[in-house]
Amino acid sequence: MLPAQEKKELVPLGAVMDSLALRYDLDFAYDAAVLRRDSLVSSALPKVFDKQWISTLLSGPQNLEVVFMGQQVIVGRSTPGSRPSALLEVSGRVLAADGSGGLPMVNIGVEGRALGTSTNDEGRFVLRYPRAYIGEALVFSSLGFVSERFSLPQNDSVLEVVLKNYSIHLPEVQVLYTDPDQLMRSVRRRLAQNYPSEPFLLTAFFRETIRQDDEYVEVSEAVVDIYKPSYQAGFASERVRFVKGRKGATARDMEVVQFKLLGGPFHFAQVDVVRNGDFLPDEEGFSAYRYLYKGVDMDNDRVLYRVGFEPLHDEEGLFYRGELRIDKESRAVVRVDFELTPASIRRSRSYLVRRDSRRFRTRPVVARYHLAYRPWGQHWVLSRVRGEVSLRVNDRDRRQRSLFATVSEMLVSDFAPADGQQRIPWSEAYRSDYVLSEQLGTFDPDFWQFYNVVEPDEDLRRVFQEGER
C-alpha cells in the first residue's frame, strides 16, 4: 500500500503523474498500451520526492519495470530480448590509437547530465539512454588520453571509439614543481566548494567476483540506490537500498565456504576518501601521511597534479600508500589509487576477513583500491569505486593451498540531488552484515534490459550463460 500523506480520493493515474511532473520536474516515458492513464489510484502524494513511492505507484498490478534516468522516468514491461521503446542503446568498444587493444575503465557520460557508464576490461560498453537525450554530446575520457565526443544517435547504434595518447607539451607554469603539502592544504580548504553541500541519491551498479586459482567460483551483481549525505555532514552515514540483482552459475563450487570477505554495496558506498577525509590533512594542516609531488597528467582535457602519499609511521592499525590526482583549476581530488602497505597487509586479516573457520588459515597478500569522481556543474560527484583483494588460503584438513582473488566494483550510473528530508528507511536499507551473494535469488536473463551496467567480459559472459540453462 502506498504511504499516503495528503487527502485521499481516487483519481486517474494520469492526473497523479501530471502532478508529480509539475512538482518534481519529471518527464514520464511509457507505452500507453502498457500503462493506462485512466486507471484509478489514490490521489495522496508523499510530502517529499520518493523514488520508491513512485515506482510502487507506476509498477501497479502488472509489476511493470520503473527506471529513473535523471529527470526521466521510464515505465515498461520486462520482456525477453526487448527494451521499452522510450530507451535507446549505443554500444561498442573503445580502443587505444597505438594498437594496444581495448581500453578499460574509460569514463562514458552524457555531457551536462548525470547519466553515465564505463568500459569493461576489454574496452567494451553499452549505454542506455532516454530518447529525450538524442543529439546531446556523449563524452569518452580516460587518464592520459585525448577525450572524444559524439552526438547521441536517433537509433540503436554501434560505435568504435579510438582514443589518442596526449603528447604532453605543457606550458612551463604547469610543469614547475609544486609544493605537495601546500597543495594538499588547498585541497582541504576548498572541499566545501568542490563537493555537494546537499544530499544526493545515486543509482549504482555493483559487481563482486571471486576466483579460486584463476577460476570463477562466485559472481554477484546488483543495482542499488545510495543515499549520500552532504560532504559537510561528516557524522551522517550512507544508506544503500537493494533494487535488483542476479548471481551467475559457476563451473565449480567454492571449496572454501567458511569465510567471507569484507565488502558488498554497503561498505563500498562508504569508500569515499574525500568525504571521510582519508589521506587529507586536517583543518590545522596536520596529516598522518607524507606527500610527494609526482608531476602532472591529463584527463578529460583537464590538467591534474599527481601527489603520492605514504604513512609517516606504519606500526599499528592499517595504513595505505598511493597517489591522488588533483584538478589544477579547482583543487578537487578527482581520482585516488591506493593499497595497503606491506606492513599493514600483515595486520589486516581480522579486518578483511569477516567470517572464518579454524580449518582454514587465511593470509591477505594484496588489497588495492581505485576511486574516481566526475564533474557535475560546479561540483564533483563520486563516480566509481573498485577494490581488489587477494588471499592465500591453507586448508589444514585437505593440506591444500589456494589463491583467492576478489574484485568488487561499483559504478554510479545516475544521480540527482535529494530532498533533505528524504532518506532510505532503515527497514529498506542494506545492512553492514549482509553478504551480497546471499541476498540474491535465481538468475534473471533480462537483468540488463533497463539499467546501465559494466558489460561482463568474455569469461563472465560464459558464467552468466550457464545460469540461463
Where in the sequence are the language-model features?
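Short, acidic Ser/Thr/Gly-rich low-complexity loop/linker segments typical of extracellular
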Residues: 113-124
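Short Pro-Gly-centered beta-turn/loop motif in secreted/extracellular proteins
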Residues: 49, 100-103, 126-135
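Short, acidic, small-residue-rich periplasmic hinge/interaction motif at the N-terminus
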Residues: 17, 21-24, 73-87, 91-95, ...
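A short, solvent-exposed loop/turn motif at the edges and junctions
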Residues: 59-64, 137-150
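Extended beta-strand-rich segments in extracellular/periplasmic secretory proteins, especially
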Residues: 277-328, 332-340, 375, 380
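Short, surface-exposed beta-strand/beta-hairpin micro-motifs centered on an aromatic residue
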Residues: 42, 122-129
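Surface-exposed, low-complexity/disordered segments
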Residues: 159-289, 300-302, 353, 358-469
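N-terminal export/assembly leaders
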Residues: 2-83, 116-118
